[in-house]
Amino acid sequence: TPERLVLVQGDTGPGQFLFGDGRVQAVVDFELASLGDPMRELAHIRTRDVWYPTGNLPRWFEYYSEFSGVPIDAKKLSYYSVIAMLTTALALGPVVQKLNPRDEHAEWIAQDVWSKRATAEALAEATGTPLQDTALPQAEHSYVSGLFDALEDNLREEQLPHIDESFRQHRMQMTLRLVAHMRNVAEIGAEIGALEIADMHSLLGHRPKSVKEGHRSMEALVRSADADMDDALIQYFYRHAKREVALMRGGMGRAEHARTSPIN
């Protein structure tokens, strides 16, 4: 139980604050709100900092502590960061599995894969698990690569400059990000899939027939696993997320080279 119970807004970013006359007039978007620990709110701010960077989040946490009188509890903040990162991944799961062509499709894919990586990193931080890096396949320039070169050049250099309406410019840029994802799937998707199956094989003890079948088996394993598997599973989640990010390389938008801000 927190020493000080607060209203946790739960999705705290600049878009949730309405300003007027130089002051905050209202706060909106409370569907994730709850009563809880102040450190949980800071964890949600830590998540949103990737998309709306403050420049020096640890210093802002210090300002918060000085102004509110609430000391920063790094251990609690790490714990709640897992929840905050996972909230986005869980929310976007159904969205990316059935993309709406009229929606922000590439942005949702980018946020989904980044949130998976951030969740794995938050789990590692909270449990003190050193993460091991993983090798990722690099694309060889093939015939398919040349086709994507032509498509991207046409869209970016021939079509986009002649679109005057800002909304349609935005939609074309979203399409270019989706094309980048498609290029990666075409160039390295098979290798990524093979790595994923081999990785799951080492944990499951049997080789799944497909990535989808393997993921179902991994879900069952996670549900039944004891704590002594935590380290191995966290390492797998991280490798899995890194592979997902590799398939979105060049289409990640603001999160292309983003990392979660440290706590202090």
Regions found by a protein language model. Give the residues of each.
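Active-site acidic catalytic loop and adjacent metal/ATP-binding pocket
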Residues: T1-L42
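Short, solvent-exposed segments of well-ordered alpha helices
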Residues: G13, W51, K76, Y80, ...
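Short, surface-exposed acidic
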Residues: V70-S78, V211
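Short beta-alpha connecting loops at secondary-structure transitions
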Residues: D103-A110, D133-A139, Q159-P161
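Charged, amphipathic alpha-helical linkers/stalks
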Residues: A124-L151
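C-terminal amphipathic alpha-helical interaction region
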Residues: S142-Q173, R177, N184-N264
